[in-house]
Amino acid sequence: MFDFIKSIIIGIVEGLTEFLPVSSTGHIILAEALMKIPGGMVWTKSFTAVFDYAIQLGAIFAVIQLYFHKLNPFSPRKTSREQFQTWRLWIKVIVGVLPAMVFGLLLNNFMDAHLLNPWVVSATLIIYGIAFIVIENRQKNIAPVVTEVNRITFKMALFIGLFQVLSLVPGTSRSGATILGAVILGASRFVAAEFSFFLSIPVMFGVTILKVGSFLLKGGSFTGAQLFVMLIGFVVSWVVALFAIKVMMRYIQNNDFKIFGWYRIVVGILFLILGIAGLVKM
């Protein structure tokens, strides 16, 4: 029973935080530390590591479901020009993904081995929280240059992708880094969030394939119970992410990202306190 409860809770946390600029990794670690969720035979160390990445696909399916028409170049409801624009958008997404793909392959293991600790996570939560507040204060009197996602240039997509590389540091938040970068480069908040969602599709698919593939190539395997627990987390993450994305996009139509900045600072301080107390272990 606790195996399923743990899967549901982590799925909820993943779905809520994957696309908000607040660090899903940090929140999953916090959830496990604060609630001391017990796990049975299912939750081996190797399975837990794979599970945390696999359920991200549920959140990605939420993006695909919500933006299927916009991202589908084969839609019969689109004109030939609109289909062409969709293909161009996908090429921009690929351009934006390339920096994270290259640096991720080179640095991923190093980051996990040396930077996945309470001090780094708390520091990045706080630093980027401050950055959101500072950038929003700077941007409040500056009109965005890019107000439609199709108007993002290839150069801009590449630079947003370079910001995404920052999210390799635990606690940064992939969506946080890309949204912040896009806003700095002149995108509206709405466009910044949308493009961040689109970038997540190839990135998360790639990371999940890399992690699960590595696990299987090393001789790992899943029991029936583990596959069922993973399926539960996947579905919960999918459903909750649908809700989180809709709420966030409605919110930023008339509000800025400063609330997320303040929230990150509070969570970062909490993370630091728990780390000092020895309650957060990685």
UniProtKB/Swiss-Prot annotation:
<protein>
    <recommendedName>
        <fullName>Undecaprenyl-diphosphatase</fullName>
        <ecNumber>3.6.1.27</ecNumber>
    </recommendedName>
</protein>
<dbReference type="GO" id="GO:0046677">
    <property type="term" value="P:response to antibiotic"/>
</dbReference>
<keyword id="KW-0472">Membrane</keyword>
<comment type="similarity">
    <text>Belongs to the UppP family.</text>
</comment>
<feature type="transmembrane region" description="Helical">
    <location>
        <begin position="2"/>
        <end position="22"/>
    </location>
</feature>
<keyword id="KW-0573">Peptidoglycan synthesis</keyword>
<keyword id="KW-0961">Cell wall biogenesis/degradation</keyword>
<keyword id="KW-1133">Transmembrane helix</keyword>
<feature type="transmembrane region" description="Helical">
    <location>
        <begin position="47"/>
        <end position="67"/>
    </location>
</feature>
<dbReference type="GO" id="GO:0009252">
    <property type="term" value="P:peptidoglycan biosynthetic process"/>
</dbReference>
<keyword id="KW-1003">Cell membrane</keyword>
<dbReference type="GO" id="GO:0050380">
    <property type="term" value="F:undecaprenyl-diphosphatase activity"/>
</dbReference>
<keyword id="KW-0046">Antibiotic resistance</keyword>
<dbReference type="Pfam" id="PF02673">
    <property type="entry name" value="BacA"/>
</dbReference>
<feature type="transmembrane region" description="Helical">
    <location>
        <begin position="259"/>
        <end position="279"/>
    </location>
</feature>
<feature type="transmembrane region" description="Helical">
    <location>
        <begin position="115"/>
        <end position="135"/>
    </location>
</feature>
<dbReference type="GO" id="GO:0071555">
    <property type="term" value="P:cell wall organization"/>
</dbReference>
<keyword id="KW-0378">Hydrolase</keyword>
<feature type="transmembrane region" description="Helical">
    <location>
        <begin position="190"/>
        <end position="210"/>
    </location>
</feature>
<feature type="transmembrane region" description="Helical">
    <location>
        <begin position="225"/>
        <end position="245"/>
    </location>
</feature>
<keyword id="KW-0812">Transmembrane</keyword>
<feature type="transmembrane region" description="Helical">
    <location>
        <begin position="152"/>
        <end position="172"/>
    </location>
</feature>
<comment type="function">
    <text>Catalyzes the dephosphorylation of undecaprenyl diphosphate (UPP). Confers resistance to bacitracin.</text>
</comment>
<keyword id="KW-0133">Cell shape</keyword>
<dbReference type="GO" id="GO:0005886">
    <property type="term" value="C:plasma membrane"/>
</dbReference>
<dbReference type="InterPro" id="IPR003824">
    <property type="entry name" value="UppP"/>
</dbReference>
<feature type="transmembrane region" description="Helical">
    <location>
        <begin position="90"/>
        <end position="110"/>
    </location>
</feature>
<dbReference type="GO" id="GO:0008360">
    <property type="term" value="P:regulation of cell shape"/>
</dbReference>
